[in-house]
Amino acid sequence: MDPWRRKVSGIIAQVALLLLVSSGTVVADMCDSVMVTHLPPSSFRSSSQLSNSHSPGFAKLNRRDGAGGWSPVSSDRYQWLELDLGDRTRITSVATQGRYGSSDWLTAYLLMFSDTGHNWRQYRQEDSIGMFSGNTNADSVVQHKLQQTVIARYLRIIPQDWNNNGRIGLRIEAYGCPYSQYCKV
């Protein structure tokens, strides 16, 4: 290929990439990194914990540490699990599991988000209030891609329903990318 055609081909490729990025296609594909897996235990808070081995720091997806996930003292709708992602983050999906090797899992939950950790907003889907279906057992993963991405530093899961033969039990992962990365694209 002569130098002129090579240059034209390079320009066409750059224009095509620019069009993909501006349409959001590349951003969506690039913004699905795990955001919870590498967080320290201090990034997790909860309304309560059943014991030290059921503490919120054990609520990471696919982990078996402690008692295999987070469980609060009481199983009621006043419980919550909170994640501090460290910085503003673009969240594109959320995945849950029950507490490993148990009868404890959520069957429905609400997702809240915040930049401050004090003022919370409830995630809402276009066609519903934003209640997410949870799990049907302790170990399968249920992942929900968010119809509208969330930009926030903090996430809070509020259990709404759980297995009738168990209690609230949760392991979680959020997928996305740093907000600063999203803004640069």
What is each of the regions a protein language model found here?
Residues S46-S48, A67, S114, M131, ...:
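Polar, glycosylation-prone regions of secreted, cell-surface, and some intracellular proteins
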